[in-house]
UniProtKB/Swiss-Prot annotation:
Listed name of the protein: Probable indole-3-acetic acid-amido synthetase GH3.2
Organism listed in the record: Oryza sativa subsp. japonica (Rice)
GO cellular component, one term: cytoplasm
InterPro entries: GH3, GH3_C, GH3_M
EC number: 6.3.2.-
Transmembrane regions: none
Gene Ontology MF annotations: acid-amino acid ligase activity
Biological processes annotated in GO: response to auxin; response to light stimulus
Induction and repression of expression: By auxin.
Domain of life from the UniProt record: Eukaryota
Family: Belongs to the IAA-amido conjugating enzyme family.
Task performed by this protein: May catalyze the synthesis of indole-3-acetic acid (IAA)-amino acid conjugates, providing a mechanism for the plant to cope with the presence of excess auxin.
Keywords: Ligase
């Protein structure tokens, strides 16, 4: 057979193989979608079976014996005998495991590792024990995401996903168990490293780049490979919105080096990891002067609006979490993406993976997550945002099963996991938005107890976010917007006051700062007062009663919040899970922020307050 005929036959064979895999993928999609329907139709029955299975497999655990379960696996005994707990309640057991005690403390199955919290959940890294087969449950939930997405966005098997994914170097507990973020655990697992080919889940980033603990080398390689494959990219994403913005910032800083590598067909000497160099060499197979010139032309314009769709023109959506605290980044992502849809696909934490968004292309403000009943046993603690906090020694409110959730009510999620956490308060506040079959759907409201407080006032993350958004509208006429913010309750003044740190971005052609310096100061002072007007009645009452001082805005120079993130990562935070803290109290972070302040502004008057209005 002639060489050309051989090549054609090989190409045809490969095409047939790909087509066959695509057909198989469609069949798997149908099976996965039916699985979702089956689980959600029989939600409460599945929950009862899951609880019985958890209690049966852990009936030899010291924790369940201590609380008198005595091998019982029924829901009634469990609720009557096992208490609702927080991390502090479980700390003694967790420390025993971390220090090397291998007895069946909370689980009859061996604890294989600890999953660390992000480092920004109430300011504390927590160690969450997990077991080997938990990876199977996480993988199962991941396997449901694309079948749902394919209902809304066709043709995703015809291209690739540009995802910026990272790990961090893990630590060991005194007893020798790994302690690492949940995504680091997953990316380093065989489930991820040896995943079978799936035409709907092809990444531009080499696995070697994702698994590199050096953040610069990892980002550089992932960005370079993403640029080389620009025509094939159909979706762009990261775990959190902040991670995707960090990638755009990286492109702004390093596009010249990236273009040089593309032009010469060589990889920068700054990337020294051999496995990355080998992987990138396969992607960067030959010089591409045309692509290099394109990168230089687009990035050299200093016009970054719509840069994502300019660099990756076939992108159909952004795959990022933009709920909760990440909602802050929606305007900036719209700016850089040219208004692409943003898909929030799943809801998970270090403690447990919970569920998925069955309408992933909905507006970010409408995102609701459907809880999958096979992931763990879930209960709800009623939460009244207007009620005074309970005393620490007060019994918690009576919990309700998810099947009995009321639409419109807010609840705190309480979980029981296969790894041995029993009736554990996660700290997430959720609002019931409806049901899919018998499964409740929730909007993520906020993390509990992320507060500013000077006197009797308590301002949570959602209130602070709303106040910042209201004040930022005053900057819009000048082409300025808030890139990032955080806050602190400054008790060094008498009375104490709220301090809010803003980092600004000015769009091309914007009129900021105003020509008159005095006008600029006036705008910021109005922003201070606008924020105060948006805060709750207790705060405004305190201001009028001089129990709280005027709110202060401190404007910081560009890049400050990247420095804050770099500092957090240097202290062990995960680059994947990092979220800029909305309230800070850690001295070195406050010192860093204050050292970058370029101007300070105070509210010029007290906000309106009436005891008869909220």
């Amino acid at each position: 057979m002639a060489p050309a005929a051989v090549a054609a036959a090989e190409a045809g064979s490969k095409a047939a193989a790909v087509a066959g895999k695509a057909v198989a993928a469609c069949e798997r999609d149908a099976e996965k979608l039916e699985f979702i329907e089956e689980m959600t139709r029989g939600f409460d029955a599945v929950q009862e079976r899951v609880l019985a299975a958890i209690l049966a497999r852990n009936n030899g655990a010291e924790y369940l014996r201590r609380h008198g379960m005595e091998g019982r696996t029924d829901r009634e005994a469990f609720k009557a005998r096992v208490p609702v707990v927080t991390y502090e309640d479980l700390r003694p057991e967790i420390e025993r495991i971390a220090n090397g005690d291998r007895s069946n403390i909370i689980s009859s199955h061996p604890i294989t590792e600890f999953l660390t919290s992000s480092g920004t959940s109430a300011g504390e890294r927590k160690l969450m024990p997990t077991i080997e087969d938990e990876l199977d449950r996480r993988q199962m939930l991941y396997s449901l995401l694309m079948p749902v997405m394919n209902l809304y966005v066709p043709g995703l098997d015809k291209g690739k996903g540009l995802y910026f994914l990272f790990i961090k170097s893990e630590t060991k507990t005194p007893g020798g168990l790994p302690a690492r973020p949940v995504l680091t655990s997953y990316y380093k697992s065989d489930h991820f490293k040896h995943r079978p080919f799936d035409p709907y889940n092809v990444y531009t980033s080499p696995t070697a780049a994702i698994l590199c603990t050096d953040a610069f080398q990892s980002m550089y390689a992932q960005m370079l490979c993403g640029l080389v494959a620009r025509a094939e990219v159909l979706r762009v994403g990261a775990v959190f919105a902040s991670g995707l913005l960090r990638a755009i910032r990286f492109l702004q800083l390093h596009w010249r080096e990236l273009a040089h590598d593309i032009r010469t067909g060589t990889l920068s000497a700054k990337v020294t990891e051999p496995s990355i160099r080998d992987a990138v060499a396969e992607v960067l197979a030959a010089p591409d002067a045309e692509l290099a010139a394109f990168v230089e032309a687009e990035c050299g314009k200093d016009k970054w609006e719509g840069i994502i769709t300019r660099m990756w023109p076939n992108t159909k959506y952004l795959d990022v979490i933009v709920t909760g605290a990440m909602a802050q980044y929606i305007p900036t992502l719209k700016f850089y993406s040219g208004g692409l849809p943003m898909a929030c696909t799943m809801y998970a934490s270090s403690e447990c993976y919970f569920g998925l968004n069955l309408r992933p292309m909905c507006d970010p403000s409408e995102v609701s997550y459907t809880i999958m009943p096979n992931m763990g046993y879930f209960e709800l603690m009623p939460h009244d945002p207007d009620a005074p906090p309970l005393p620490r020694d007060a019994p918690p409110p009576r919990l309700v099963d998810l099947a009995d959730a009321e639409v419109g009510r807010e609840y705190e999620l309480v979980i029981t996991t296969y790894a041995g956490l029993c009736r554990y308060r996660v700290g997430d506040i959720l609002q019931v938005t409806g049901f899919h079959n018998a499964a409740p759907q929730f909007r993520f409201v906020r993390r509990k107890n992320v507060l500013l407080s000077i006197d009797s006032d308590k301002t949570d993350e959602a209130e602070l976010q709303a106040a910042v958004e209201r004040a930022s509208a005053l900057l819009s006429p000048y082409g300025a917007s808030i890139v990032e913010y955080t806050s602190q309750a400054d008790a060094t003044t008498i009375p104490g006051h709220y301090v809010v740190y803003w980092e600004l971005m000015v769009r091309e052609g914007g009129a900021w700062p105003p020509p008159a310096e005095e006008e600029g100061r006036g705008v910021f002072e109005r922003c201070c007062l606008e924020m105060e007007e948006a805060l709750n009645a207790v705060y405004r009452q305190g201001r009028n009663g001089e129990a709280i001082g005027p709110l202060e805005i401190r404007v910081v120079r560009a890049g400050t919040f990247e420095e804050v993130m770099d500092y957090a990562i240097s202290r062990g935070a995960s680059i994947n899970q990092y979220k800029a803290p909305r309230c800070v109290s850690f001295g070195p972070i406050i010192e860093l922020l204050n050292s970058r302040v370029i101007s300070k502004h105070f509210s010029p008057a007290c906000p309106k307050y009436s005891p008869h209005k909220k």
